[in-house]
Each structure stands twice: as C-alpha cells, then as structure tokens.
Amino acid sequence: MCGRFLRISSLTEVVSAFEATGDSELRLSFNVPPTTTVYAIRHDETRRLVEPMSWGLVPFWAKDTKRASNAINARVETLTEKPSFRHLVKNHRAVMPLDGYFEWDTVTATGSQPKQPYLVRPSIGGEQSFDGMFAAAALWSTWHDPEQEGVALQTVAMVTTQSVGRL
C-alpha cells in the first residue's frame, strides 16, 4: 500500500505527458503525505483535466471529512465490494501522476524496529535508473459539506494491489 510518494514533476510536465489541461500549480514535494493536495487527471466530456484533489477519498455520502486519511488507497481486489469505492468504478476513474513512491521495511540489525523508507520507481527494459513520471490508477469523488452550502471538496484514492515478487 502506498502511504507516501514523490512529486517532482511540474504542472507543465504533467499537462504535456498526459495531453491534458490544467492551471493549478502545486508545490513540488519529495515526501507527499496523506490528505495533501495532489494532482489527479480525470476525463470530462471532451478532454483530460489535471485537477488538484485532496489525497484521501471522502465518499459523497459522508457526514464529514474525518476519515479521509483512512481512504488513501483502494485495493483493486475489493473495489466493487467496498461502499466507499464501488459506485466510483464506472464513472469516477482517474490517474495520479507520481515520480516514485515509498515502501517501508523494518530494519532489525540494531535489535530495534525502526522503519526504513525505500523509494520505488519503475525500471525501463531492465535498467535500474528511471528519470520520469508514471501514473497510478485512482478513483475520485466530490464531497459536499452538509454544514456549508456550496462548499465542495474533490478527493482521490490510489488504486493498489499486491506486489508481484520482491520489490
């Protein structure tokens, strides 16, 4: 499961790579945590849009945003079963552009259990280096605040699955 990722590509690079439109430049980050505003690319009637969304899906039916950080990932194996995601699969698909993501491993050499982050990036043709962005599948939703008329929040969850083999 992805809990942090790397975003060092600019809006211009994202727009160009995905042949999309967008006008909200976000701050670059080497450590994007849950609930941060991230880029999500979705399709409207005629074009691809790069939109800022909060990372942590809040279902449209939620009373508040308190559990957003619990829904940063959507497991592909259970997408059609979970109430938060099943209604989004058909019409609320997106991609999240990334430059890498972090996985943590427990280090036991010292006898303690600190977590060590490892940056994961794709390799191209067996090469160990990769300099560029890639995309993760995602689902998005718009949540309307029941307490404040006209206040809406666009949120997104990354679709994840089990890794194949060792990372």
Task: Please name every model-derived segment.
Residues 1-167:
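Short linear sequence motif anchored by a di-proline
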